Amino acid sequence: LAKLERLCAAADILGCAFIRGFAFFAPEEGPLPAETLAPYFERPVRLLEQRGKTLLLEADPSVNTSNHAALARLVEAIGSPRVRAIFDPGNCLYDPLGETPYPDGYEAIRPFFAHVHIKDAVRAVPESYCVKVGTGQVGYPALLRRLAADGYAGWLSMETHYRLDSHLTEEQMRLPGGAGFSAGGAAATAESVAALKDILQKE
């Protein structure tokens, strides 16, 4: 709760209404269900109400909501307008349950998301990996058309876990940070931003 308070203070300084978060790392025995997790958000919701901020939860394979269907169940169980979701279609391709980014992931989280992350990836064994936007399995042309058709007017936030000449490790993806994570990020981001602009212009 103290960390959320600090994040609210930082958001005030930056003029941000949204704060990104996750539904806690999943225990080794498996993810907790929405009805177990929801009570843990009662005090954070009260703080968010006091500070006028909205917490946007993200689906991620390392947390209790590994996909957008699970995340939608949690947001619905919390039942507060101060807790919404991020739609991150690239994370679907790391989901151990195999959620499809579009249409399945999108349809599941559509009533709840207020922000979109952009990255592309390929589902693979033993480990999925990120690629330049538009060259993976997200299917961005169809997804972007759907976002436009549904009237989405929020941000598209580039989340570059792709690198030109290497792949980030699972641990780097789980806990990003440091020089090793950042190395090569600028060039890969520039390439993916150009690719996204190209897709948007064509669509």
Enumerate the predicted regions with their spans.
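Active-site acidic/histidine proton-transfer and metal-coordination neighborhood
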Residues: 1-87, 179, 183-186
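Histidine-acidic metal/acid-base catalytic patches
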Residues: 9, 15, 68-203
